[in-house]
């Protein structure tokens, strides 16, 4: 399920892109890159993230924004958070791939808090959804109770309004434009009826 999401998201990466991967599921996309020159950025101050380290080669001083140990590629650079967010807010990130708790039919994103639950803060997502040239959200289509996370309107506090360009779930791929949500692709083995049944949001079919 998660593997299908990650592999599909990796297809959106293009040669020479500067890409920010959100915490959690999006970080796994870096492991799918092969033979392309993609520069991954992390908002804690790193440009040039590599794949996850192999056992026995972990450097505890190298971590991403989610505090996971990582590797770096030749030519990687390190800098402070002010410079990192200047890159993001200045429009220098070609693509941000973020996780999501809810996405609405007009491209609103909620991914930073659940009311009454302890959180560390909003992180860099609010800057990324407005600074990156393209925003892709990857997430499971339904929550653990089987309820759709693809909503008519988000019920959780918003990260950004109308900021999502593309949504990739374990069931389908959607694109957003002109305040409309369009189904453009089904995941392997998934039917249109399954997507309709599991989706609260209204969408156009553009298969």
From Swiss-Prot:
Give yes or no: UniProt keyword Transferase: yes
For this protein, the record's InterPro entries field holds: 3-oxoacid_CoA-transf_B, CoA_trans_fam_I, CoA_transf_AS, NagB/RpiA_transferase-like
Q: What is its EC number?
A: 2.8.3.5
Group of enzyme by EC: transferase
- Where is the catalytic site? 43
Q: Which SUPFAM superfamilies match?
A: NagB/RpiA/CoA transferase-like
**Does the record carry Transferase as a key word?**
yes
Q: Which domain of life is it from?
A: Bacteria
Write one Pfam family the protein is assigned to.
CoA_trans
Catalyses which reaction(s): a 3-oxo acid + succinyl-CoA = a 3-oxoacyl-CoA + succinate
GO MF terms held by the record: CoA-transferase activity; succinyl-CoA:3-oxo-acid CoA-transferase activity
- Keywords assigned: Transferase
Q: How does it assemble?
A: Heterodimer of a subunit A and a subunit B.
Q: Its family?
A: Belongs to the 3-oxoacid CoA-transferase subunit B family.
Which PANTHER family would you find in this protein's record?
A: KETOACID-COENZYME A TRANSFERASE, SUCCINYL-COA:3-KETOACID COENZYME A TRANSFERASE SUBUNIT B-RELATED
Q: What is this protein called?
A: Succinyl-CoA:3-ketoacid coenzyme A transferase subunit B
Q: What is the native source organism of this protein?
A: Helicobacter pylori (strain ATCC 700392 / 26695)
Q: Which gene encodes it?
A: scoB
């Amino acid at each position: 399920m998660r593997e299908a999401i990650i592999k599909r998201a990796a297809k959106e990466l293009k040669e020479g892109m500067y890409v920010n991967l959100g915490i959690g599921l999006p970080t796994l996309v870096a492991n799918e890159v092969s033979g392309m020159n993609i520069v991954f950025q992390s908002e804690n101050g790193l440009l040039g993230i590599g794949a996850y380290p192999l056992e026995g080669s972990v450097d505890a001083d190298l971590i991403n924004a989610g505090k996971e140990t990582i590797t770096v590629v030749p030519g990687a650079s390190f800098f402070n958070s002010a410079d990192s967010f200047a890159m993001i807010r200045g429009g220098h990130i070609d693509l941000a791939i973020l996780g999501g708790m809810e996405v609405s039919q007009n491209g609103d994103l909620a991914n930073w808090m659940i009311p009454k639950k302890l959180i560390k803060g909003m992180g860099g997502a609010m800057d990324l959804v407005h600074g990156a040239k393209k925003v892709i959200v990857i997430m499971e289509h339904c929550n653990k109770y089987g309820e759709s996370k693809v909503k008519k309107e988000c019920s959780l506090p918003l990260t950004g309004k109308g900021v999502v360009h593309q949504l990739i779930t374990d069931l389908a791929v959607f694109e957003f434009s002109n305040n409309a949500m369009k189904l453009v692709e089904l995941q392997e083995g998934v039917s249109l009826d399954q997507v309709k049944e599991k989706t609260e949001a209204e969408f156009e079919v553009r298969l």
